Amino acid sequence: QDGLDQRIQELLRCQVRERARRLEDPSLVIIDTQSVRAAAGVPKTTTGLDANKKVSGRKRGLAVDVLGLIIGVVVLAASAHDNTAGTALLDQAAERCGMRLEKALVDQGFKDEVLIHGALLDIDVEVVRRNPADQGKGFVPQPKRWIVEQVNGTLMLHRRLAREYDHRPDTSASRVYWASIANMARRLTTPAPSWRDTLGLAA
C-alpha cells in the first residue's frame, strides 16, 4: 500500500520520542547527503556521477532529529546538487513536524538556495562550519551534525542499503524507511537495563 512505510515510520518515531520524554515532533533537524555506489543493472537514467566524491550511483539525503530518528528521506541521482536534496528534505520535515520545527543544521555543501527555501518555510537553516582550531587534527566530529553521520553508518549495515540495488529511487527510499522501522522496533521492544542488570553483567 502506497505510503504505508512512512505512516509506520511516523507512528514509531513518535513513540520512541515519547519514551525519551520528548514531544512528538522535534524543533531541530539535521540534514545531510551521502553518495552510494549503484550495483550492476541499475538503470543509468536514475543514477549519475558525484564529481566531488568520485562515486557513480545515487545520492541519499536524510533529515533526522537529535535522537537519530529519520524525519525525511530523498534518493536522487548522485549527480544532483545537495541543494536539490536539501530543499526536498526541508519540505518533508516541515510537513511532518509542522510549526514546531524551528531550525535545520546542514554542512557547507548546501548553498544559499537551501537557506532561502528554509526562510520561506519559516525554518532557520544554519550552515555548520568546521572549527579552524581543529585543522590538522584529522577527523573531528561536529556536535549534533555528527548524529546524521551515525545514522548513515547504521543504515549501511543493512545489506540492501550498502549499495543501490533498486531500479527505482522511490523503492530505494522505501528501503531506508523499513530499515529505520526495524531499528525503532528494536528500541521499543528491548527493555532498558536496570541497575540489577548492570550488577549481573559486572559479576
Protein language model annotation of sequence segments:
Residues 1-203:
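Short alpha-helical elements
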